Amino acid sequence: MPIKIDSNLPAHKLLENENIFVMTEERAVSQDIRPLKILILNLMPTKIETETQILRLLSNSPIQVEAELLQTATHEVKNVSKEHMLKFYKTFDDIKNERFDGMVVTGTPVENMEFEQVDYWDELCRIFEWSKTNVYSSFFICWGAQAALYYKYGLKKYQLDKKMFGVFEHVSLDTFHPLMRGLDDKFWVPHSRHTEVRRGDIALIKDLQILSYSEKSGVHLISDMECRNFFSTGHSEYDRDTLAKEYFRDVEKGLDIDLPENYFTDNDPSKTPEVKWRSAANIIFSNWLNYFVYQRTPYDLSTL
């Protein structure tokens, strides 16, 4: 998917170096089509790394995408320059009168806190409520998924005895669902979290369907019955070295952290990790964009 982003965004050069088609404004306006407008609410502290990961996945089909980066105004960003945030990110007040074909909400490492304790929780709730009328389809990732499930359905998260950390095998529970089309019988997904949502709780909510599951890491993909909201408990967007960075960071801090499972070659952290989740990640995001955004969203977004 040709993706239209600011040519000065760090992700632009990184993606071009990977031979990913990044479209300039000049090229985009010369094409007589309406691009999909996708809003990315980036809650992660690693802003540049995460925005690049999400943009990479959004670029993998022939439809033109125009991505907009969103931050929460009620949280002070410390891991990236203010210049970067001012130049490339908007706040809710900037976009609240706009409409979007799709929205991606990332995770963030605040899961050990109660939702209401997160400093931008009220703002996030306003964005969730706004998205009901201003966004056609949304894709929520990890803590973003837990937060949305809690806001929309009152679904609780539970503390795990040990961090769910590694790359785990999953199966589809509905192979005929369009989001699952093209996936292998078993596919791999990275997870990195201290909390979980439970299958039994989800089963009590008639508006939700579990699409994929892992015997080790539990519920993975969830959809509402309208197929306008999708929730992922994993991190399909992760790079080869993302879990390694998290592991070595925690080791440096002296934290009690196990090796990520099914990740390092020969379970040896000195060896390069083997990527086995990328094809599934591309399929899931391409299916979401194609079947649930491109094929369903109105041409005139004002009619949402």
State each model region's role:
Residues 1-74, 89-95, 99, 126, ...:
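Amide-donor transfer/coupling interface in amidating biosynthetic enzymes
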